């Protein structure tokens, strides 16, 4: 009877031991983008506010229950007037759509490349988005106090067409490129 009781006590530990919850570290992330400007050069920008979390199944090496939220009014291109224009209804329309979200449906992880298939919701329109990247490292963080958390580092890239989300400003004349290159770098802390 005692043996059965001990097994029942350990069952939740055994069941949940292989899944780790992670929260994106807001001080170690970058979501950047590149967009063509009149064919001369690409403009580099980024979003400075993000929230996100996910679960990592260590036994099967899969990522689940993910949710990434990007604050659209955090757009930054190092040019105040351009940033104001990007926040206007011509582009991000931040007063109506204060957030864009990404949720992965399928994540294939191997040693060489991680492929993340998901759904990006931008301007209220949800479209598929595939990101290509890799998990750089999962280990105890080398800095900090006595308790050093486990951290996962991820790099990823992808491309979206802004017209797919109804963002049509200057697409027709190719003054602002339709394709947006995404560059994502972040660390997430195991909870």
Segments predicted by a language model, with ranges:
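Low-complexity, acidic/polar, glycine-enriched regions of mature
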Residues: 17-191
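Sec-dependent N-terminal signal peptides
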Residues: 4-14
């Amino acid at each position: 009877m005692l043996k059965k009781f001990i097994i029942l006590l350990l069952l939740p530990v055994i069941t949940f031991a292989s899944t780790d919850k992670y929260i994106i570290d807001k001080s170690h992330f970058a979501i950047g983008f590149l967009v063509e400007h009149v064919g001369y050069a690409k403009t580099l920008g980024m979003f400075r506010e993000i929230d996100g979390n996910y679960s990592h199944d260590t036994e099967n090496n899969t990522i689940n229950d993910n949710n990434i939220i990007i604050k659209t009014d955090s757009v930054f291109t190092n040019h105040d007037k351009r940033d104001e224009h990007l926040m206007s209804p011509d582009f991000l329309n931040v007063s109506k759509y204060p957030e864009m979200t990404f949720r992965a449906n399928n994540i294939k992880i191997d040693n060489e490349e991680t492929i993340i298939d998901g759904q990006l919701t931008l301007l209220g329109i949800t479209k598929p988005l595939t990101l290509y990247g890799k998990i750089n490292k999962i280990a105890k963080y080398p800095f900090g106090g006595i308790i050093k958390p486990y951290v996962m580092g991820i790099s990823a890239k992808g491309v979206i067409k802004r017209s797919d989300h109804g963002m049509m400003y200057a697409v027709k004349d190719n003054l602002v490129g339709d394709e947006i290159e995404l560059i994502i770098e972040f660390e997430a802390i195991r909870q």
